[in-house]
Amino acid sequence: MLKWALIFFVISLIAGFLGFSGISAATAGIAKILFYIAVIIFLVFLVLALAVGGAVT
């Protein structure tokens, strides 16, 4: 997931450098969405690991 966020971030930087602001805004928006999804999934797994980890040991 973070791989795709980085790919869209690089694409948005290239598009911004070339002056295609519409493409840059769209790819930056997609990269932000993917980043936030990855953070939410990380937090869910962190909470699950803390909850289940205590039960296992």
Curated annotation (Swiss-Prot):
**A Pfam family this protein belongs to?**
DUF1328
Per UniProt, subcellular location reads as:
Cell membrane
| Protein origin, superkingdom | Bacteria
Q: Which chain regions cross the lipid bilayer?
A: 4-24, 33-53
Protein biosynthesis among the record's keywords?
no
Annotated membrane topology? Multi-pass membrane protein
Positions of disulphide bridges: none
Q: Which GO terms describe its cellular component?
A: plasma membrane
Q: What is its main location?
A: membrane
Keyword list (alphabetical) reads: Cell membrane, Membrane, Plasmid, Transmembrane, Transmembrane helix
Q: Mind telling me which NCBIfam families this protein's record contains?
A: PRK13682.1-1, PRK13682.2-5
> What family does this chain come from, according to its entry?
Belongs to the UPF0391 family.
Task: Spell out the HAMAP family in the cross-references.
Answer: UPF0391
State the name under which the record lists this protein.
Answer: UPF0391 membrane protein Smed_4051
> What is the organism of origin for this protein?
Sinorhizobium medicae (strain WSM419) (Ensifer medicae)
